[in-house]
Amino acid sequence: ANPYQLATVFTSETAFNGNPLQSSSTIGMNPNLKPEKTSSIEAGFEAAFWDNRLYLDFTYYKTDSRNQILKLATTAASGYTSQVRNAGHIRNRGYEIQLGAVPIQTSKGFRWNLDLNYGANSSKVVKLDDEGLITSYQLYSSGIQILASVGEAYGTLFGTSYVRDANGNVVVDANGLPKISTTNKTLGKFTPDWTGGISNTFSYRSLSLSFLIDASVGGSIFSNTNKTGKYTGVLANTLSGRDAEHGGLWYYTDAMGNNVRLPESPSYSVSSDGLYYAQVNGQSTRVYQDGIMVEGVTESGSKNEEVVSAEKYYHRIYSIAEANVYDASYVKLREVALSYRLPRLWTQKLHLQEASVTLTGRNLWTIYKSVPNIDPESALTTGNAQGVEAYSLPTTRSFGVNLSVKF
């Protein structure tokens, strides 16, 4: 354990009236902390056939981690808001498979190496305290919660959701906007269901070309970029419903403040300040073309027929965490490399045993992803806030030249 978690220490503050001032933490330290413990078992086998032209490597593992050091809430009467203590039992189990083959190998120097790998991991929070009183521990909270909850996968995403009826239809309120749940629910987990990759290397005499494709399937990500982008209307996918050209419905607001959909595009005029007017019931009335009709049902179960402005709709889903949680699956062309091994006659003149030049490129192409506008590998931190993205920069492609020499 960190030695600063074993005893209360004081922090120097700005002097008061020339007198030294120190403050103590609101976190109660614990001199009885124990080291975290991890026990694991692993079993596997390797097999090779046809002079190593085909090989298989399989591994199964099970890992139990206990005595995690957590900051748990405590009564304020103790003088602290939380206390450091040992708690938690997390179990991980999974398997990894690697399959390799040399499908083609000729006497003229051509060779094709193929490698496949696949891995799946399942995590479960077995318990958080010995007494069984704590059922959930918050790892992160801002717009959405990342939790360790007993009986669930480590790192579940927990937040507000759409209200739905028994048939799964979104329920709208009296104004035609999606209703927000009054209680939070599990919206996913940040760990993938499985990961895998395929690597190919084609070599012919002194030339070699290789490429790597990897994939991650399953898992969820909460995107603050998409959340805020919808609210402010700066994303291309929020053009939907903004005007008639992008599917917006024409409507006007009656004397009672209700939006009334127009059956068709009206014959309108545009005022000097850019507002639209049309004849409605024999009167010149301001009309709008940014109407959206949410696909859903009313609280009574009838089909929704209320029109809302695109602005109000996108502002509403800003507050619904479920609307901003996406599938984090992806398939990427991770790396391509072209290598040339210099002729031995050249290397001998340079007093070298071997030399090669390699051109490389990384993160060249995202073949598939589900989440828009961001890289699904983006993360707020590498710690407990995995599964949360916040205004991340685009992933960069990189290119390089490597010179390898052997004396």
Question: Language-model features: where?
Answer:
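Surface-exposed, extracytoplasmic segments of Gram-negative outer-membrane nutrient-acquisition systems
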Residues: 18-26, 64-87, 115, 122-190, ...
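Extra-cytoplasmic beta-strand recognition segments
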Residues: 196
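Short alpha-helix boundary/capping motifs
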Residues: 190-191, 393
